[in-house]
Amino acid sequence: MLTRKQQELLLFIHERMKESGVPPSFDEMKDALDLASKSGIHRLITALEERGFIRRLPNRARALEVIKLPEAYTPGARPQRGFSPSVIEGSLGKPKEPEPAPAVKAPANDFAGAATIPVMGRIAAGVPISAIQNNTHDLAVPVDMLGSGEHYALEVKGDSMIEAGIFDGDTVIIRNGNTANPGDIVVALVDDEEATLKRFRRKGASIALEAANPAYETRIFGPDRVKIQGKLVGLIRRYH
């Protein structure tokens, strides 16, 4: 599955080539996707090439060929924006302010004292991956796990947070927000396209995303590359 930014770039290249017969320049792609630098475009093109959607033609400048399009592509359609929570959509790098929690209901077929929150897809506890871009289903959680604010759930993929007691297949409960204190476990959006679950630290002016597994290195980013999308407030684990 493509991330939103990958799909935006693929469709932009495709539509531009239909209109003019030549691919857009890197500057045009950067501006179209509202990215801060061309390095982000290079990463997106490499990802699209690895997934078999485009290929670079050798010995020719700006030579790209679109091999295939997403199955759900509609000619002339633009990728949808404005999903909530912003971890799923990125909000073009402008995280959404937390909103008052909507009224929640106790599920008719579940235990008393429970509320339902949306499960918004998967989050990486490992190398960053894209979260699924829609509400996959709802989850019943104890109301005393939530507190104030807007909440959502994500299913964990990976093992980088095992020493914090977070395992592959767990479901994490996230309070939506765009700030964090050092030591908080957060959902972080990296380069406006990929989400990861890590412990938040500051290293001078930079942001460190710290794993809880010695097999993974702490990753350091400039402050403009990381957007906080919420803090961990609870965890649900199923035993089979």
Curated annotation (Swiss-Prot):
Signal peptide: none annotated. It is an enzyme of class 3 (hydrolase). The active site is at 160 (for autocatalytic cleavage activity), 198 (for autocatalytic cleavage activity). One of its GO terms (molecular function) is DNA binding. GO terms for biological process: DNA repair; DNA replication; negative regulation of DNA-templated transcription; proteolysis; SOS response. It holds the Pfam family LexA_DNA_bind. The record marks 125-126 as: Cleavage. Keywords: Autocatalytic cleavage, DNA damage, DNA repair, DNA replication, DNA-binding, Hydrolase, Repressor, SOS response, Transcription, Transcription regulation. The keyword DNA damage applies. Its EC number is 3.4.21.88. Gene3D superfamilies: Umud Fragment, subunit A (2.10.109.10), Winged helix-like DNA-binding domain superfamily/Winged helix DNA-binding domain (1.10.10.10). It comes from the Bacteria. Represses a number of genes involved in the response to DNA damage (SOS response), including recA and lexA. In the presence of single-stranded DNA, RecA interacts with LexA causing an autocatalytic cleavage which disrupts the DNA-binding part of LexA, leading to derepression of the SOS regulon and eventually DNA repair. Belongs to the peptidase S24 family. PANTHER family: LEXA REPRESSOR, LEXA REPRESSOR-RELATED. HAMAP family: LexA. This is LexA repressor. It comes from Agrobacterium fabrum (strain C58 / ATCC 33970) (Agrobacterium tumefaciens (strain C58)). The lineage of its organism: Bacteria, Pseudomonadati, Pseudomonadota, Alphaproteobacteria, Hyphomicrobiales.
